[in-house]
């Protein structure tokens, strides 16, 4: 049996921009993408601490320190909102019990403070 389990998390990132006229996605700085063990086009869930919104989108590479929601997702956040970005993986139950997710903590400038 496979189950969904937390694979990666960027904890308490700050939204730096919201671009309604872009095709879609979340732009994340490359250093955070790598640190969180994410890849471009990977599905992620966004949890907005400020307004309680939870929604899915996909990752694209952005500028250093950038957390920008694009397209329709831009309507779900405000610049300055604190968000948690999570990705899940499907794996066998036994493997999932031993699996350790990648968790990256950032400061209010989206700089890594703890991995």
From Swiss-Prot:
UniProt GO MF annotations: aspartate 1-decarboxylase activity
Modified residues annotated as Pyruvic acid (Ser) in this record: 25
Top-level enzyme category: lyase
Compartments, as annotated in UniProt: Cytoplasm
Cofactor binding remark: Binds 1 pyruvoyl group covalently per subunit.
Predominant subcellular localization, coarse grouping: cytoplasm
The UniProt record lists the keyword Lyase: yes
Function: Catalyzes the pyruvoyl-dependent decarboxylation of aspartate to produce beta-alanine.
Protein name (database record): Aspartate 1-decarboxylase
Gene that this sequence comes from: panD
């Amino acid at each position: 049996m496979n189950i969904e389990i937390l694979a990666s998390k960027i904890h308490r990132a700050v939204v730096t921009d919201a671009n309604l006229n872009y095709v879609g996605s979340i732009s994340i700085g490359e250093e955070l993408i790598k640190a969180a063990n994410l890849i471009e086009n990977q599905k992620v869930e966004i949890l907005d601490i400020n307004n309680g919104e939870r929604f899915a989108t996909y990752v694209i590479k952005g500028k250093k320190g950038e957390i920008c929601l694009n397209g329709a997702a831009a309507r779900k956040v405000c610049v300055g909102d604190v968000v948690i970005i999570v990705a899940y993986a499907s794996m066998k139950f036994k493997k999932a019990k031993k699996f350790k997710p990648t968790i990256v903590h950032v400061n209010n400038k989206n700089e890594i403070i703890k991995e």
